[in-house]
């Protein structure tokens, strides 16, 4: 029987509901409980797949091909449970489902309303998402008081009544600002945030109080008095030097035990040894490297959230402090490759659109010709192939049909047919919708014998997540191979190129898949670990 923890935020956005939810889930998992987390997004887009990274940040892809909120990446990095399309839904998705039912006649001609039809669909999705686990945390996006959040909060209110106190509790994350000139923390914003919640019928059971520094006992007592939350359940959550300290921080305030007490559950003692080891590795590096990440969305680093984290995870597993130098690809075009000279390794991540392409190609060429370790991901693999075609094979005008449909040498082209994660054939053409039409989700890849990528993974077949609609054009494979480019991996049906390598290079690997989506701080990822190790060796050679 699943218990639900509903997580809301108040006062301001970006307080860290996702990290707080994931950290609590990690502590509960460390007590032997099976945990999952849902993210409910109030925006009207069906999913974030077509949203600009500047608007939304990264689109995180699950094994089953769902394009989801980046918070699901945090969830997977903190707990062992794999997220699926059930773990994230939006207002747009809910309305789409309800309207489809209305068109089908499921409501028998009745008037379709927010209550009960929209709220019922939200409740149905929450209960389905929590099926089969001990505890499901449900994070409501946005801030209490937002007009977009109202149907979700009403659904939570109804579920709390229907499930009862033994199966549902509300945890509210709020800001307790520290006013330096007065030398004190202010509890009024929290009081008003809870007042707003109570006005719609929701009484928090737990308050997580975000603050610059730990709030004192008197402030906690005052918050407890004015919000009707027991004092021990007013939990401080001060700024931390590392997000990996937060599970231990929450456990030190007995938040996990408070949750279990409220649910009437018993569980094993907390074992956070793995997280303590992560923190130990983070705080005791033996090496330091600089990675030049050359991309398009450098003004919003959340656009590469999983990639940033994967590089840091690799640093943990090689005892290396990883500094990421974020370089706008257009700056390479205007300033030249000299801005890459301090890098121990170069990385070109995924992306869409032609802007910055030439700068990425310049970065690839610099890495290839100067023997600097290079990792290309998704578009980073496609740019590696284009650069190789232009500068090694001398195919002037080689390009992707995404950027130039009239290219004389279209070495990258649209995928028109592939097998999806369910084993079904999917087809697309130039007129297909942009939303939800890419090759998405976990796909099996076959790694070639004697390739670097097979040596890195240590096995012949791997499963990695994808998000793309363009691929290497097989018409040019013979030329690419003859020129010295090695095909390191293929799709399961041996029709799509998954990995390319430059053999006469210390470390040059580019992949069509997104390995960053499966990297975690506790386990790392073999590809990133090998890449950072190559950067360490490059750094030592340069000394």
Swiss-Prot record:
Binding site for CTP: 13, 146-148, 186-191, 222
Molecular function per GO: ATP binding; CTP synthase activity; glutaminase activity; identical protein binding; metal ion binding
Presence of the UniProt keyword Ligase in the record: yes
Region feature Amidoligase domain, mapped onto this chain: 1-265
Top-rank EC class of the record's enzyme: ligase
Entry superkingdom: Bacteria
Residues that hold Mg(2+) according to the record: 71, 139
EC numbers: 6.3.4.2
A single Gene Ontology CC term: cytosol
UniProt keyword Aminoacyl-tRNA synthetase present: no
GO biological process: 'de novo' CTP biosynthetic process; pyrimidine nucleobase biosynthetic process
Amino acids binding UTP: 13, 186-191, 222
Entry binding sites for ATP: 14-19, 71
UniProt xrefs under Pfam families: CTP_synth_N, GATase
Active site: 378 (nucleophile), 514, 516
Pathway(s) this gene product operates in, as recorded in its UniProt entry: Pyrimidine metabolism; CTP biosynthesis via de novo pathway; CTP from UDP: step 2/2
Domain Glutamine amidotransferase type-1: from-to ranges: 290-541
UniProt KW keywords: ATP-binding, Glutamine amidotransferase, Ligase, Magnesium, Metal-binding, Nucleotide-binding, Pyrimidine biosynthesis
CDD domains tied to this protein: CTPS_N, GATase1_CTP_Synthase
Function summary: Catalyzes the ATP-dependent amination of UTP to CTP with either L-glutamine or ammonia as the source of nitrogen. Regulates intracellular CTP levels through interactions with the four ribonucleotide triphosphates.
Description of how the protein assembles with itself and partners: Homotetramer.
Name of this chain's protein: CTP synthase
Species for this entry: Saccharophagus degradans (strain 2-40 / ATCC 43961 / DSM 17024)
């Amino acid at each position: 029987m699943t218990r639900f923890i509903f997580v809301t935020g108040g006062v301001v956005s970006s307080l860290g509901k996702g990290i707080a939810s994931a950290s609590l889930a990690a502590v509960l998992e460390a007590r032997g409980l099976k945990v999952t987390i849902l993210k409910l997004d109030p925006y009207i887009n069906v999913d974030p797949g077509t949203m600009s990274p500047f608007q939304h940040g990264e689109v995180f892809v699950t094994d089953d091909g769902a394009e989801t909120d980046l918070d699901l990446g945090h969830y997977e990095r903190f707990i062992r449970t794999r997220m699926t399309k059930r773990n994230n839904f939006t207002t747009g998705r809910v309305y789409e489902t309800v309207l489809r039912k209305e068109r089908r006649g499921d409501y028998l001609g009745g008037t379709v309303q927010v209550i009960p039809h929209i709220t019922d669909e939200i409740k149905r999705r929450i209960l389905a998402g929590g099926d089969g686990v001990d505890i499901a945390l449900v994070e409501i996006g946005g801030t209490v008081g937002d007009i977009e959040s109202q149907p979700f909060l009403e659904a939570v209110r109804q579920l709390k009544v229907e499930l009862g106190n033994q199966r549902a509790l509300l945890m509210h994350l709020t800001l307790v600002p520290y006013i330096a000139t007065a030398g004190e923390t202010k509890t009024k914003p929290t009081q008003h945030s809870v007042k707003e919640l109570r006005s719609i019928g929701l009484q928090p059971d737990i308050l997580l109080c975000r603050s610059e520094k730990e709030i004192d006992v008197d402030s906690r007592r005052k918050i407890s008095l004015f919000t009707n939350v027991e004092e021990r359940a007013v939990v401080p959550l001060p700024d931390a030097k590392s997000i990996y300290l937060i599970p231990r921080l929450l456990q030190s305030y007995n938040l996990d035990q408070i949750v279990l007490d409220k649910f009437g559950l018993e569980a094993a003692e907390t074992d956070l040894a793995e997280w303590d080891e992560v923190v130990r590795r983070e705080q005791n590096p033996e090496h330091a490297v600089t990675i030049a990440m050359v991309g398009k969305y450098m003004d919003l680093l959340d656009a590469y959230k999983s990639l940033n984290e994967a590089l840091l995870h690799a640093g943990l597993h090689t005892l290396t402090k990883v500094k990421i130098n974020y370089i706008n690809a257009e700056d390479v075009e205007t300033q030249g490759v000299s801005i890459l000279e301090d890098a121990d390794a170069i990385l070109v991540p995924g992306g869409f659109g032609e802007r910055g392409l030439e700068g990425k190609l310049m970065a690839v060429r610099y890495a290839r010709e100067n023997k600097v370790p290079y990792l290309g991901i998704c578009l980073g693999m496609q740019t590696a192939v284009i650069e190789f075609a232009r500068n090694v094979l001398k195919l002037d005008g080689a390009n992707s049909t995404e950027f130039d449909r009239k290219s004389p040498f279209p070495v990258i082209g649209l995928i028109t047919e592939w097998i999806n994660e369910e084993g079904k054939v999917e087809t697309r053409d130039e007129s297909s919708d942009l939303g939800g039409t890419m090759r998405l989700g976990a796909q099996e890849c076959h790694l070639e014998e004697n390739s670097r990528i097979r040596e890195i993974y240590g096995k012949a077949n791997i499963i990695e997540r994808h998000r793309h609609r363009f691929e290497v054009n097989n018409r040019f494979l013979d030329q690419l191979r003859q020129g010295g480019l090695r095909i390191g991996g293929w799709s399961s049906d041996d029709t799509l190129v998954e990995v390319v390598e430059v053999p006469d290079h210390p470390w040059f690997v580019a992949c069509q898949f997104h390995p960053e989506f499966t990297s975690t701080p506790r386990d790392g990822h073999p590809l990133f670990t090998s890449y950072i190790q190559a950067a360490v060796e490059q750094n030592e050679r340069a000394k």
